[in-house]
């Protein structure tokens, strides 16, 4: 693609997409065929987000309280998915929830909490920096698109239940 448009992400992405389409066309495949082949090889991943909006000064306080509650008392599980590791980027710590072992993240401090779950599933919480919101991002791996969709929907409901 070259380096002539470093700050033009959309242009670079379009060029990369066209290059991929040409590559797979030579192999008798569409981009969809290639994506399905990657799913079959690596798994079906699905991500979503859940946002809670709380307006005003009380809302900002409530958002801070939710983050502090999750930080000080991380959930042991979301539904039947046990939290394996808990990352607190603000305090630069990763806690193995089974052994209690602590290591550092080695990354810049940020008000972000990340929960590692079994089978490549995860949940991440962070307050918005520009709006009165707290956002929860979730990801799962399934054996099919339908399985991944069902898993991410269940994880979303399990996260809501913890809150």
Task: Show which residues each predicted segment covers.
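Phosphate-binding and adjacent anionic-ligand microenvironments
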Residues: 1-126, 133-135, 144-149, 156-163
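Active-site beta-strand/loop architecture of penicillin-binding DD-peptidases
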Residues: 139
